[in-house]
Design a protein with these regions (language model features):
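Active-site beta->alpha loop and helix N-cap motifs at the rims of alpha/beta catalytic domains
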Residues: 2-132
């Protein structure tokens, strides 16, 4: 995993996370497989429109309905199609910390610019525990 300080990350975000961003939906084929061509088409369209970035497997991307392997497949497709032409963010939340680490590592390997991690959504903690 990348090593950087909180301040370095904030400085990078202040400079780079600007403009219009979009959340990619995860399209499926009639056979209920990930629609690779659909994802590629959506990414190309965002680039054509001048979007600054795209997030995948977020709420609109139905992260809760995808297997870990499907989420990784989406990361691979988005990374390949975006080719550095827009910033990419991967939602890596899961109820298992091992799966979070696996997804985060895979997204980093695919050269994603940002990771999005929501606070645990099953057994929740007090506000100060989440912030820590």
């Amino acid at each position: 995993m990348s090593k950087y300080s909180k301040n370095e990350a904030q400085d990078w975000a202040n400079i780079n996370v600007t403009g219009q961003w979009s959340t990619l939906m995860t399209p499926f084929t009639p056979e209920d497989d990930i629609d690779e061509n659909g994802i590629r088409s959506d990414v190309r369209r965002l680039i054509e429109l001048g979007s600054q970035g795209a997030g995948c497997t977020w709420g609109m991307g139905e992260f809760w309905s995808l297997t870990t392997e499907e989420r990784k497949q989406v990361y691979e497709i988005v990374s390949d199609e975006s080719e550095g032409k827009l910033l990419t963010a991967a939602h890596v939340s899961h109820s298992s910390i091992k799966t979070v680490i696996d997804l985060a590592t895979h997204a980093e390997d695919q050269k994603f610019d940002l990771l999005v991690l929501a606070a645990p959504y099953f057994v929740t903690k007090k506000e100060n525990q989440v912030i820590e």
